[in-house]
């Protein structure tokens, strides 16, 4: 069925065209979330204000159009997909208000969970929920799912730390529980609804058997069904309503803002890994630890340990553990080091009577801690990495009463064996009896679907009926467990949930078939295919963890969406379906606007670099190999041509003036489809070719200086206050520190190959790289001298897969911190400095080092929030300027009190200067300004 014409007409008047999507590519891309279900929406709307949400809900109510809300799309149970209208959050939902020295924080639903904690960190506080997806998931989803996590338990989830909420009901009515005027207006307009909620609360509390059941169920971690505990925990109907919205998964209303009572984030922590000989011993230890000063206790069965035993950094003994071994990863936190040590002694004393097979003692070392927690965090992706192409990874989420945890674990393992899930692993938040089990599942045949159905029926019977546990502890009911809500809760509680749903959403327009469904087979419908597409991306589980760092997300596609569309294209081709229209749209949205810098790989739990797929696809369309060969073998001429182009651009600026040239250039770029680069105010002037011969008899320590080709071509912008070139500044700083600067021979013909690689000419790129490596070996006297490269992208290109261990290569950050700190005296400036950590700096592992260097140089360092990749991507800032503009759309406000920024990439600095409204320079400019040579 299509959407009503009246709804579409009025929605078009309400929402601009650029925020409405109904084309096949966009609806498929947005139709995907992290669950193993898929629905294709008929219309996707990106909303930027509460007023728009209100108006859309009023339209949906009028025309009986179902709507679903989406924040980050990282939920796992099918609660954020729709075959009707999908409403997704735009940029303008990132507001915050920190109160009372961080003891409270008010957040809009588009804030990423980790960002909220970053804001609270200076106060030693954090929000209570700590889901594994906290670096990607957003507050809207955290609240709507009542997400918890490893340390959160039940006491610190959203329900129990809720201080206030702003919501929109299905009829478009707003309520802000922290605004007296809003509350008064709501009481006047919705008095009967509030009285009905109060009545349901009274009758529930009066039903002693039902009330006792509700209290018992929420003693455990539980997100199955609606939050009935609101009816027994509160008398005031506004409190009931606000807490019903928590965990409602978008079925009762839209959450516009939430205020949390924050929790203490203790600075001192230690972790240990203790392996017990069997499940029973391990779970008995959990019972003891529940009364100990522990912040997290994670259980890992033998299968989960086996899945990561070959990973780097794993304790060697993991490979030799016995067949029934079961481990606990324990963390304790405290306000002081002395208190932490007391707690650790107390914890170990409590476990003294238990037999232990192996253990890693408590450590406070951050790196060792990270290694231990990597065991836990790598288990889920470990299954994903070995799954058969075409199957999906399913992670289920149940709770047993802690005192029955050992029996529950063994019974689950029996079900794995019964239904032939041999690869299934089991781990979880042991203190709460909350277990996750991960397995691979194909849905390509009725036999596989039937196997899954039989398994889930057995799991539901085991957990909900035999043990009285929770079928969803923290992942939300979604579609996945909707058919089992009545089985877990019983008829009285189930009907009570339906009463609440019909009271708050009488026309059933809010996320139908989620949490509550009249279809007993809903969990077996709309199962998502994961067809083979390319071995580079076939392991993708579509979790969405990559999306926050992608510069094109919100402009075109995210890495997850690129993979989704490419999978669909390949599946259609195999089925003989025409894909020309989809591929034509994908060329721009999937290929042309991908920065291909690979930050997505850093966030991906299975290490997928979607940029590599894009480069591969570009190579298939790279039809000018002969030209690339000529450019590579005549590189000095190529650079001279680039300098000439900059001369022409600079002349045009002086002739036409910057405003007219900018307008003309934008038109030419658009008409030429990116073939003519777009001019902007930060466009560099041409740099003269380097002419430099060091003294032969120089006795100073040598450093080989590799000036990247962009540094050799691009000088400062005409309007830049700093008119010294990067080469001049770098050479001056190195000599100030007492180094003899040596340049490779034939420098103007040398290149790392990055310009060729980014265009899909891999052969020419590698030829140039190898030529440069040979020149650097010669210049460094066989690797005797360190090699300084003045841009981090060039350094990264050289060190990746570097076979020759003789070369000692440095980017600016690493060289300054390892070679120059001891030779220079720093006098930090008071003027604020903005820092952009480039993608390559992140890949090189120098992010924190760059920030620390900046703090040596300035007492006021500004790191803009939410900008991970600038989107300039070599030359895309010239040819696809909208990518750079989109990625840096928030930069100007973030750096408004700075007069200068620093980076480690000359091309990135062009876009940063243009969109930040301040001059960005290389790190060496700042270091040179605030240092002098130390007296010998």
Could you say what each language-model-derived stretch is?
Residues 142-144, 148-158, 162-377, 410, ...:
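C-terminal substrate-binding/cap subdomain adjacent to the FAD-binding core in PCMH-type
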Residues 516, 553-586, 607-633, 919-928:
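Non-heme iron-sulfur electron-transfer modules
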Residues 509-514, 545-568, 593-620, 797, ...:
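Iron-sulfur cluster-binding cysteine motifs and their immediate structural context
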Residues 11, 35-67, 85-131, 143, ...:
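N-terminal glycine-rich flavin-associated loop
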Residues 1-62, 72-103, 251, 255-269, ...:
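N-terminal flexible segment immediately upstream of the FAD-binding catalytic core
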Residues 382, 483-532:
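Activity-critical C-terminal alpha-helical subdomain
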Residues 522-542, 574-596:
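Ferredoxin-like iron-sulfur electron-transfer modules
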Residues 505, 611-936:
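Iron-sulfur cluster-binding electron-transfer modules in prokaryotic oxidoreductases
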């Amino acid at each position: 069925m299509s959407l009503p014409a009246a709804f579409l007409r009025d929605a078009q008047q309400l929402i601009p065209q650029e925020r409405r999507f109904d084309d096949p590519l966009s609806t498929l891309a947005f139709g995907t979330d992290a669950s193993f279900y898929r629905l294709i929406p008929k219309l996707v709307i990106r909303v930027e204000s509460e007023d728009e949400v209100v108006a859309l809900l009023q339209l949906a109510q009028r025309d009986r159009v179902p709507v679903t809300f989406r924040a980050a799309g990282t939920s796992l149970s099918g609660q954020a997909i729709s075959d009707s209208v999908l409403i997704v959050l735009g940029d303008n939902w990132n507001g915050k208000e920190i109160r009372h020295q961080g003891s409270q924080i008010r957040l809009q639903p588009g804030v990423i969970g980790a960002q909220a904690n970053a804001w609270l960190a200076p106060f030693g506080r954090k929000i209570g929920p700590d889901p594994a997806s906290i670096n990607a998931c957003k507050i809207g989803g955290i609240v709507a799912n009542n997400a918890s996590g490893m340390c959160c338990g039940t006491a610190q989830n959203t329900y129990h730390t809720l201080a206030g909420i702003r919501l929109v009901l299905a009829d478009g009515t707003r309520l802000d529980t922290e605004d007296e005027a809003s509350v008064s207006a709501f009481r006047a307009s919705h008095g009967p609804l509030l009285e009905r909620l109060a009545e349901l609360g009274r009758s529930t509390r009066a039903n002693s058997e039902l009330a006792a059941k509700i209290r018992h169920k929420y003693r455990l971690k539980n997100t199955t069904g609606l939050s009935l505990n609101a009816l027994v925990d509160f008398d005031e109907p506004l409190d009931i309503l606000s807490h019903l919205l928590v965990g409602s998964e978008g079925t009762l209303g839209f959450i516009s803002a939430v205020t949390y009572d924050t929790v203490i984030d203790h600075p001192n922590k230690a972790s240990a890994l203790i392996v017990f000989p069997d499940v029973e011993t391990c779970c008995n230890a959990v019972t003891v630890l529940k009364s100990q000063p522990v912040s997290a206790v994670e259980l890992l069965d033998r299968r989960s340990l086996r899945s990561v035993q070959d990973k780097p950094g794993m304790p060697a003994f993991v490979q030799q553990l016995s067949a029934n071994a079961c481990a606990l990863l324990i963390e304790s936190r405290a306000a002081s080091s002395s208190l932490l040590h007391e707690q650790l002694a107390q914890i170990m004393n409590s476990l003294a009577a238990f037999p232990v097979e192996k253990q890693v003692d408590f450590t406070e070392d951050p790196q060792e801690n990270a290694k231990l927690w990597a065991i836990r965090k790598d288990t889920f992706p470990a299954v994903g990495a070995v799954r058969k192409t075409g199957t999906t990874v399913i992670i289920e989420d149940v709770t047993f009463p802690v005192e029955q945890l050992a029996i529950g674990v063994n019974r689950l393992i029996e079900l794995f064996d019964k239904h032939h899930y041999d690869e299934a692993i089991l781990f979880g938040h042991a203190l709460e009896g909350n277990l996750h089990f991960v397995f691979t599942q194909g849905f390509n045949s009725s036999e596989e679907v039937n196997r899954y159905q039989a398994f889930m029926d057995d799991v539901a019977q085991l957990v909900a009926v035999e043990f009285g546990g929770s079928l969803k502890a923290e992942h939300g009911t979604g579609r996945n467990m909707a058919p089992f809500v009545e089985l877990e809760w019983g008829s009285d509680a189930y009907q009570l949930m339906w009463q609440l749903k019909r009271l708050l959403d009488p026309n059933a327009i809010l996320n139908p078939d989620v949490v509550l469904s009249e279809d007993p087979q809903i969990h077996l419908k709309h199962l998502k295919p994961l067809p083979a597409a390319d071995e580079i991306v076939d392991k993708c589980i579509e979790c969405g963890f990559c999306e926050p760092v992608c510069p094109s997300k919100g402009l075109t596609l995210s890495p997850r969406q690129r993979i989704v569309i490419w999978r669909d294209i390949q599946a259609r081709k195999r089925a003989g379906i025409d894909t020309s229209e989809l591929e034509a749209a994908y060329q721009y949205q999937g290929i042309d606007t991908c920065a291909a810098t690979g930050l997505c790989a850093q966030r991906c739990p299975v290490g997928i670099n979607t940029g590599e797929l894009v480069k591969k696809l570009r190579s298939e369309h790279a039809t000018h190999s002969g030209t690339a060969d000529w450019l590579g073998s005549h590189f000095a001429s190529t650079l001279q041509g680039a300098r000439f182009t900059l001369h022409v651009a600079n002349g045009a600026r002086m002739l036409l003036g910057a405003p007219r040239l900018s307008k003309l250039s934008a038109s030419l770029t658009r008409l030429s489809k990116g073939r003519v680069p777009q001019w902007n105010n930060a466009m560099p002037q041409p740099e003269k070719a380097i002419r430099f011969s060091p003294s032969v008899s120089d006795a100073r320590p040598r450093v080989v200086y590799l000036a990247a080709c962009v540094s050799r071509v691009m000088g400062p912008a005409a309007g830049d206050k700093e008119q010294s070139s990067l080469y001049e500044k770098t050479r001056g700083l190195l000599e100030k520190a007492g180094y003899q600067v040596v340049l490779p021979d034939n420098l103007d013909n040398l290149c790392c190959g990055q310009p060729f690689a980014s265009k899909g000419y891999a052969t020419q790129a590698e030829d140039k790289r190898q030529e440069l490596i040979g020149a650097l070996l010669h210049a460094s006297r066989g690797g005797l001298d360190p090699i300084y490269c003045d841009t981090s992208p060039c350094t990264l290109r050289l060190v990746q897969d570097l076979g020759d261990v003789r070369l000692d290569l440095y980017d600016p950050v690493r060289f300054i911190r390892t070679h120059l700190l001891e030779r220079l005296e720093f006098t930090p400036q008071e003027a604020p400095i903005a820092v952009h950590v480039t993608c390559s700096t992140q890949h090189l592992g120098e992010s924190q080092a760059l920030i620390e260097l900046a703090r040596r140089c300035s007492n006021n360092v500004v790191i803009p929030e939410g900008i991970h990749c600038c989107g300039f991507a070599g030359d895309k800032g010239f040819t696809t300027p909208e990518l750079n503009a989109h990625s840096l759309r928030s930069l100007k406000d973030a750096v408004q009190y700075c007069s200068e920024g620093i980076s480690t990439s000359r091309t990135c600095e062009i876009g940063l200067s243009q969109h930040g409204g301040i001059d960005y320079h290389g790190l060496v400019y700042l270091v040179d300004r605030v240092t002098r040579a130390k007296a010998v």
